[in-house]
UniProtKB/Swiss-Prot annotation:
Enzyme class: translocase
The encoding gene: MT-ND5
The protein's assembly and partners: Core subunit of respiratory chain NADH dehydrogenase (Complex I) which is composed of 45 different subunits.
Domain of life: Eukaryota
Organism: Ornithorhynchus anatinus
Protein name, UniProt field: NADH-ubiquinone oxidoreductase chain 5
Amino acid sequence: MNLLFFSSLLTALIILCIPLLLSFTPYYKLENYPHHVKTMIMWSFIISLVPMLSFLNGGVEATVTNWHWFTTQTFNLSMNFKLDLYTIMFLPIALLITWSIMEFSIWYMSSDPKINQFMKYLLIFLITMLTLISANNLFQLFIGWEGVGIMSFMLIGWWHARTDANTAALQAILYNRIGDIGFILAMAWFLIHTNSWEFQQMFLLHTNLLPLLGLILAATGKSAQFGLHPWLPFAMEGPTPVSALLHSSTMVVAGIFLLVRFSPLLEQNSTALTMALCLGAITTLFTAACALTQNDIKKIIAFSTSSQLGLMMVTIGLNQPFLAFLHICTHAFFKAMLFLCSGSIIHNLNDEQDIRKMGGLINILPITSSALIIGSLALTGMPFLAGFYSKDLIIESLNTSNTNAWALSLTLVATTFTAVYSTRVIFLALLNQPRFSPASSINENNPLLINPIKRLAIGSILAGFLLTSYINPTTLTPTTMPPFIKVTALVITILGFILALELYLTTNNLTLKPHSQLHTFSNLLGYFPLIMHRKPTAQNFFLGQNMATMLIDLTWFEKSGPKGISSHQLTILTSVTEAQKGLMKIYFLSFLITPPIIITLLLF
């Protein structure tokens, strides 16, 4: 069984590398290279099911050391792979979602002359994420961490002729640099105090708040928590397949996964858990509130990602790392599907992204619309869809834990907001009369478009049930929970639906009035980009200008530099020159002063 486990896992990873090796051959320039990449990922997914089923049957974890890297005094560094529950379960999920996105990309990017390079970048994006997931030491994890960061920069700015895409790519890399500072400082602390970067050695150490703060900062940047969140909504400026892969199973969940990996240390420090809880609660409410008034369909879905990441951070703060990982897995299915559905709509409507200019699509794009409804319902936590099995457990854990009641309240309000903006997308984009140009050529009869969406729709329906049925600790149902707590998540979700429906029916025929301050606050993202991107930039510019002109130019050149020396010399020369005017009284005065000075010097 072990031989089958390791050989199948190694085969799945090797197959992923074949398209990368082909990129150095003439085959890379052929038209069927994208299809080859898609096929390799499909076979890799099928083979990865073997170790997953083997793990579910035996439940044996393993650590594999493939290559000893180097040794410096007492510090050893090897290429280690940690094959535990998180790695084995996430691998087929990531491969299935990437397979679907790759197939969708062949249709979506068919007119792009560099589609081969685009597919290669997506594949590298996946490989770096799998490197991060399977790493057994911090250095290897850091390679995957930086890999997903640089690949997100390359892919978000894929359409580099667009200013918005370049700005979004720069935002992503700069905000993540701030988080990387925390990661590097945590690595340095662990190296100094444990002389090792392997997880097994670090987890033996008595917990300390400093490295945990660095890890939380790293997760805040990578998973777009409040304060370092503005890059995520703007990351949708890249092609839709990039958004689907980035928001579902790669970049943004890396920060949460980092904290899941370090849960043995986090659970020993209540301060770090409280920080994660409060940070996640603020993030999930703020981003859900921002999503309420957005009109760009991709931006709404992007804000929903940030809100769900906040919910995962809340789960980390509750010391429930497995529930956070479960929500990562279920969220990946319907979030990827939501982005693919939005890409189908945008592509068919000639790049129109405003939901106010859509409508009636359920009759024109029935498969896409049905999948969008399934994804929206799964996002809200509707029973028996994928999101319900993880989201309901998180709300139950919040209700039954002795934690900050404000965090619980904020999370419940954010859950209601999720139902509101999901319903708003369904009503404006899919129902009622069409509000787009009749010249749009709409057609979804393409297997490259329909098959990925169908595949992810099935996953959005069944993934939660399958994951919670066969994996501990969710297989045991708690029996001591009061009924009113058990149905809390469902009640607030239904309230959100009712609220959205009432608001839509009430305001449908009303004349437009100037927006309220709350609407403006939500629509402008809490003024956060305005404050953080303009004010500090202007202050730094003026500070740098003043330092350059006042301190450097004025002080160095004018006061103490060449001009300063010449001005001082000029003063002395002027005094000496004025003393030599040819007046007899000045000569007699100097004659009288000179002898006393000479006598004084001789005596003392």
